[in-house]
Amino acid sequence: MGLEEKLPGGVLLTTVEKLANWSRRSSLWPATFGLACCAIEMMSTGAGRYDLSRFGMEVFRASPRQADLMIVAGRVSQKMAPVLRQIYDQMPEPKWVLSMGVCASSGGMFNNYAIVQGVDHIVPVDMYLPGCPPRPEMLMDAIVKLHEKILAGSVSGKVEHTKVGSAPYPKPIEVATAWSGLPAGAVDTRTLSVNDRKRFSLPEDAPVPAGRGAVEPVLDERRPAAIAPPSVFGRGKRVPVDAKPTDESRAGGPGPSTETLTDD
């Protein structure tokens, strides 16, 4: 006499892991995290034509504490990298990450100092989706494959993701130096502010690199004159840019001691 003869009809036997993973797969709530044009395809997937709600994913949450899946749709800039990591840390376990499009997966066409060359430098990625941008059918296929991975997972402890490098995420200047082909220790001034850029600028007597040609310096005396506000230098007065107002000029007098040009 088998076990099925002792149990009443309608009883289904399964394991706790299968039941828990089935529940996770059937109620996967994505976080609202569209970064670029791939987000348009992600929104189309959630609309009525493709109906992502068939997979229990129609609820896009604006709060990371209520989301299970982060769909990184679009390229990740250097300034967005710490924000993305913070949102990922705020998501409760278990959580998954889907990299949508080549820009999110590897930087895509934006191979420069401003874009992170792959979101897996910041967060662990469970599913990579190619395309520029991927169609809604491709996103749904990636989600189905992620469902299969969730069903095969374990409920004990944390969910195993693809590992991120053990080193902390580098600063933008360090990343730009590594990606731009500059020698070690060099600084890519494109990532600096205007004030910091002056500290790394070449001196006036520095030799010009070969192939670039000499650049004629702009002398102070060649600067064009600017029309000063009437409240400072008097109405209709034209003075050099470097000229400073005097007490006499404030009262509408002849102006600063330097040469003053009139409208005549």
Swiss-Prot record:
What cofactor(s) does the depicted protein rely on?
[4Fe-4S] cluster
Give residues annotated as binding [4Fe-4S] cluster: 37-38, 103, 132
Where is the stretch described as Disordered? 201-264
Major subcellular site = membrane
- List the catalytic activities from the record: a quinone + NADH + 5 H(+)(in) = a quinol + NAD(+) + 4 H(+)(out)
Q: Which EC number applies? A: 7.1.1.-
Record localization: Cell membrane
InterPro entries, from UniProt?
NADH_UbQ_OxRdtase-like_20kDa, NADH_UQ_OxRdtase_20Kd_su
Sorted keywords for this record are:
4Fe-4S, Cell membrane, Iron, Iron-sulfur, Membrane, Metal-binding, NAD, Quinone, Translocase, Transport
Bilayer topology annotation:
Peripheral membrane protein
Instruction: Indicate yes or no for the key word Repeat.
Output: no
Q: What are the record's GO terms for cellular component?
A: plasma membrane; respiratory chain complex I
Give any GO molecular function from the UniProt entry. iron ion binding
Q: How is the cofactor bound?
A: Binds 1 [4Fe-4S] cluster.
One biological process term from GO is:
electron transport coupled proton transport
> What ranges does the record list as Basic and acidic residues composition bias?
239-250
Pfam families recorded: Oxidored_q6 (PF01058)
Self-association or partners: how does it assemble? NDH-1 is composed of 14 different subunits. Subunits NuoB, C, D, E, F, and G constitute the peripheral sector of the complex.
Q: Which family does it belong to?
A: Belongs to the complex I 20 kDa subunit family.
Physiological role = NDH-1 shuttles electrons from NADH, via FMN and iron-sulfur (Fe-S) centers, to quinones in the respiratory chain. The immediate electron acceptor for the enzyme in this species is believed to be a menaquinone. Couples the redox reaction to proton translocation (for every two electrons transferred, four hydrogen ions are translocated across the cytoplasmic membrane), and thus conserves the redox energy in a proton gradient.
> What's the protein here called?
NADH-quinone oxidoreductase subunit B
> What broad taxonomic lineage does this protein's source fall under?
Bacteria, Bacillati, Actinomycetota, Actinomycetes, Frankiales
